[in-house]
């Protein structure tokens, strides 16, 4: 498909911002579509051994002078006798009353994966998979459109995601999976073993970037005899997304075609009784039927096509 070809307009919430790898600090970027309830931002990196402090600001605009309003500042401090985290809001040129959280859940020299989950009334923060703090908004979330990172921090990747629609309303905390750049394990075609098959509740996560001139993208689930009970196939020539059965029958998925050249994507497959539920870029797109015995006999996930992979989890 030509890069000049017209793309159908789709809602901002369907489009995911590509991850940023190894940004130079200080680093600032616009958040595509701004923040809204259900948006997640992940931050992977390392705390330098000499670190005194760093801050992650979710801002209303990006001007340098005057300083923009900051809806939420997350600032770990390592230089005191008792390391802690400061959270605060900056409005109209003034910082408001800060909230101090004892402990940091991080130490100098530690690698980390911090996940910011934005909900209707508050933001929740987890560090390395453990819930750490929550902070009620003092400014409207809809005003936030900029991320700024500064201080003593080495950042490996910044990710922008929508919450998993399969756990909406659940008390479970979202799981943050790291983004990897140029990992040999993610070369396409990519294969992952499923030694125990798939069971209800299991989620397959595939994240990547569509290449410049793509033809197709397929995600296949094979059993121990190399039989392929089901395949998810995106065709860029006719702009269709479909489930393909083992005998070649197609079941088109009627939804906006979200795979576009040089755009980031996230595929989620949830195993449930009687089949698989699909979500793309955080949007549920229905299910396909597969009996439990067939699900348990699956032994391999195989990904092929014109994509660059950043994360595969199953």
Curated annotation (Swiss-Prot):
Looking at the record's lineage, which domain of life comes first?
A: Eukaryota
**Start and end residues of each Galectin domain:** 27-161, 190-314
Location, primary (coarse class)? nucleus
Carries keyword Repeat?
A: yes
- A biological process term (GO) from this entry: intrinsic apoptotic signaling pathway
| Gene Ontology terms for molecular function | lactose binding
Cite a single Pfam family from the UniProt record: Gal-bind_lectin
Q: Which UniProt keywords apply?
A: Apoptosis, Lectin, Nucleus, Repeat
Q: Where in the cell is it found?
A: Nucleus
Which Gene Ontology CC terms are recorded?
A: mitochondrion; nucleus
UniProt function note: Binds lactose. May participate in the apoptosis of adipocytes.
Give the domain section of the comments.
Contains two homologous but distinct carbohydrate-binding domains.
Q: What protein name is recorded for this chain? A: Galectin-12
């Amino acid at each position: 498909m030509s890069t000049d070809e017209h793309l159908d307009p789709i809602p901002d919430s369907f489009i995911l911002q590509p991850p940023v790898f190894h940004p130079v600090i200080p680093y600032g970027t616009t958040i595509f579509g701004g923040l809204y309830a259900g948006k997640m931002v992940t931050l992977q990196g390392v705390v330098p051994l000499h670190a005194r402090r760093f801050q992650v600001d979710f801002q209303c605009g990006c001007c340098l002078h005057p300083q923009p309003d900051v809806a939420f500042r997350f600032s770990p401090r390592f230089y005191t006798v008792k390391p802690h985290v400061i959270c605060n809001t900056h409005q109209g040129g003034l910082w408001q009353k800060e909230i101090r959280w004892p402990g940091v859940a991080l130490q100098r020299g530690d690698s980390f994966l911090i996940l910011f989950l934005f909900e209707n009334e508050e933001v929740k923060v987890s560090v390395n998979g453990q819930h750490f703090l929550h902070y009620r908004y003092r400014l409207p979330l809809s005003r936030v459109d900029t991320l700024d990172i500064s201080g003593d921090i080495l950042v490996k990747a910044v990710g922008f995601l929508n919450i998993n629609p399969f756990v909406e309303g659940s008390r479970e905390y979202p799981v943050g999976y790291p983004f990897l750049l140029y990992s040999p394990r993610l070369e396409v075609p990519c294969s992952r073993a499923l030694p125990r098959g798939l069971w209800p509740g299991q989620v397959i996560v595939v994240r990547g970037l569509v290449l410049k001139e793509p033809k197709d993208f397929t995600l296949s689930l094979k059993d121990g005899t190399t039989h392929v009970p089901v395949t998810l196939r995106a065709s860029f020539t006719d702009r269709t997304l479909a489930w393909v059965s083992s005998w070649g029958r197609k079941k088109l998925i009627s939804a906006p075609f979200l795979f576009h050249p040089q755009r980031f994507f996230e595929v989620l497959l949830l195993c449930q009784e009687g089949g698989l539920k699909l979500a793309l870029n955080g949007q549920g797109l229905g299910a396909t039927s597969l009996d439990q015995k067939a699900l348990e006999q699956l032994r391999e996930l195989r990904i092929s096509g014109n994509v660059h992979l950043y994360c595969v989890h199953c």
